[in-house]
Each structure stands twice: as C-alpha cells, then as structure tokens.
Amino acid sequence: MTAELQPEAGALLHTELMSLNVGPQHPSTHGVLRLVVDMDGEYVTRVEPHMGYLHTGFEKTMEHRTYQQNVTYAPRTDYLHSFSHELAYVLSVEKLLGAEVPERANVVRVILHELGRIHSHLVFVGTGLLDLGALTPFFYAFREKEACQDLFEAVCGYRMNQGYFRVGGLARDLPEGWTARVEAFLNQMERGVEEYTTLFAANPIFLDRAKGVGVIPADAALDLGLTGPNLRASGVPLDNRKDHPYCGFEDYDFNVISSPDGDSLARFNMRLLEFSESIKIIRQGLQKLRPGPIKDPNRKISLPPRHELETSMEAVIHHFKLVTEGFHPPLGEAYVPIESARGEVGYYVISDGGSMPYRVKIRAPSFVNLQALEYACVGVQFADLITILATIDPVLGDVDR
C-alpha cells in the first residue's frame, strides 16, 4: 500500500527557522564581518551582525601617542576614504589649539578629500555589483580607482592610508604638474561615469535585484542614526559640507543629492550622482589654488622649514621640542563633524594639557549604518540580503576601530 504523502485538507505544515552564518570569511562581507541570519525558508526573519573581528584598539593607542603622531593612525580606520578620518582628526585638534590653517592648505585638503570620496565610491560600484554577479563593472571602476591612487601616490608617497594632513596644515606642498594630472583624471572620470551608467543603470537584471529592495524610509533612517549617502537615499538631504561647513566648503557651489525611494537602487544611484558633484568641487578647488604657505606659521605647532634650521637656533629648539615631545593643547575638548563617503565622521578629542590626548572617541559612520541592516533585511529573500549589505557599504576598519 502506498503511503499518503499529501497532508490532509486544512492541516498546517510545521516548519522550523533555520539559522545561517554568513562570514566572517565571506567575500560579500567586504572584511571580517559575521552575520547570524534566521530564515523561514528562503526569507530572512532576523539578522544579527557580530562585529569585533578587526578590532585594532586605535582609540586607546591614540591616547598614548602625541597629537601629531596620531595622524598616521586615523587614516587606517577607513582605508577606502582615508583622507576623511585624518581630516576629521586634525580639525578637532586644530580647534583645541586655535590653529590658523592657510588658505592653500584648506583648498588642497578639499581637493584630496573629494578625490578620496571618488575613490571610495569607485570601490563601492565595482565590488557592489560584483556581489550581484556582475563582473564587468568591477574592471571598469577599478581602472579609474588605480588612476586615482596614482594621484595619491604622487602627493603622499602612499596609495592608501596616506597620513598627508598635519595639525596646522599639510606635510608638504603639491608636486609640480600634479594639478594638470588631476584635471586629466577628472575628464577620465566623466567618461567613466557615463560608461557605468550605460552598463547597469538601465539593466533589467540589476533593476530587479535593487529596485524596491531593502527600503528604509526617512523616519526610520533618522531613528537608526544613518548619515551620508544612505540617509540621503531615504530622502533626507543632510550633508555636513553644507550644514556644518569646514575647510571653506561654504565657498564651493555644489548640490546635495537625495532620493525619496530609500531602496537599494537609490543607494546605488546616490554614489553615481555624487561623482559629478565631487568633480565639480575639485574643479573649483583647482581654480582657487594660489601660491602660499601650507602650514600654520606658529612654530610651537608646525615644524620649521629646513632652511631655517641652518640659520636659527630658535628654529632648532622648536624642531627638537615638537619631535621629541610635541605641542600641548590647552585643557578642553573638541569635535568637528565632517562628511565622508559613508557619512558623518568625527573625532571627539579631550585634552588634559599634556602632549597626548586624554581621550579620543571616533564617531565612525560604518558602525552606525550597519545597525540598519536588520531593519532593511527582515522579510526579504536571502539573495537580497547581499544586495542590501553591499548598498549600505560598510568598511570593517571603520566598524571595529
């Protein structure tokens, strides 16, 4: 007699939730992130991010280094937009000191800050679409990424983790011919953005994977603390370059792009549209560049130039004190928020009057943005979780610190 395999009419099927580990060794996590995912069949019911696999202890380390030494630690937090972290750090220390940054140094900071944003978004476009199974855009985006890193190398000597900014200004001036190379790169980027748009912006497979997936409405985005492109993709046009200008951003003409959709497609499009705004800002910066000093003239903050060391004993003393001990900001605390490729970055620095910070607290956007993952993923299919994680765009060094 054949066994009856079909349930009786009206009988309920008993199902159990399945718990699945994604990472910490998984290419779609873009680092060592572990996700514990509960699923009912193919649908996600809960996502719990497990962080800490890349914990570096930078905050504590920075409390045992001089203020100037810490410039080399800050950029290693977000290794895709390193300039954002070193800029946020030096701005907070300069606020403590009351330092005066020369105009040329501020313009160079803006140019490199926006080049760093372009670099980060290029990695987002290439790796994000790779997560969805599209291999070709990866090579297109990394073509421009390598050209961008060539510019960093020419200025700093490093392609990543640059450490070029200094409290009070810059480490050194721009090399000869660098601005012409930047202009050539911007022309290349404009052609590249057109190619990226042609490749996937109207691709029906990409649209099916991204449109309406992982929707985060504006009120939820604000409650979750989202900032940057992820917040603007939910219809909230907040940007620290406009709302809390720094480095003279109030003198630059650019638009804050936003979208009311709040889905994965909107988060992708934010980065594409921000390419053009960054290009616009950099071109204005190139026009603003004028010859001039690149450091605060206060010798108690900035190292004296080498030619002064040959003729001035006072310069030698300042140099010795800065190298061996560093400067001493007055008692106080400072926090300057800036706009990185992922959102608001800020370094809360407390001074006790010594040559090392009493406390450094890093406000990193990736850590906060990752808290929105479960909200965006509940109810979607597992394949969509990878899409949503890619569009949130966390950097694990930015998360764990």
Curated annotation (Swiss-Prot):
* Cross-referenced SUPFAM superfamilies: HydB/Nqo4-like
Principal cellular location given in the protein's record = membrane
Alphabetized, the UniProt keywords read: Cell membrane, Membrane, NAD, Quinone, Translocase, Transport
Q: What does this protein do?
A: NDH-1 shuttles electrons from NADH, via FMN and iron-sulfur (Fe-S) centers, to quinones in the respiratory chain. The immediate electron acceptor for the enzyme in this species is believed to be a menaquinone. Couples the redox reaction to proton translocation (for every two electrons transferred, four hydrogen ions are translocated across the cytoplasmic membrane), and thus conserves the redox energy in a proton gradient.
- What family is reported? Belongs to the complex I 49 kDa subunit family.
| Short name of one Pfam family | Complex1_49kDa
Which enzyme type, at the first EC level? translocase
Q: Is Plastid included in the keywords of this UniProt record?
A: no
EC number(s) stated in the UniProt entry for this protein: 7.1.1.-
Gene Ontology molecular function, alphabetical: NAD binding; NADH:ubiquinone reductase (non-electrogenic) activity; quinone binding
User: Would you say which domain of life the source belongs to?
Assistant: Bacteria
GO CC field = plasma membrane
Regarding the membrane, this protein is recorded as: Peripheral membrane protein
Please list the reactions this protein catalyses.
a quinone + NADH + 5 H(+)(in) = a quinol + NAD(+) + 4 H(+)(out)
| Subunit structure and binding partners | NDH-1 is composed of 15 different subunits. Subunits NuoB, C, D, E, F, and G constitute the peripheral sector of the complex.
> What is the protein's name according to its record?
NADH-quinone oxidoreductase subunit D
Q: Which residues form the signal peptide?
A: none
Q: Where in the cell is it found?
A: Cell membrane
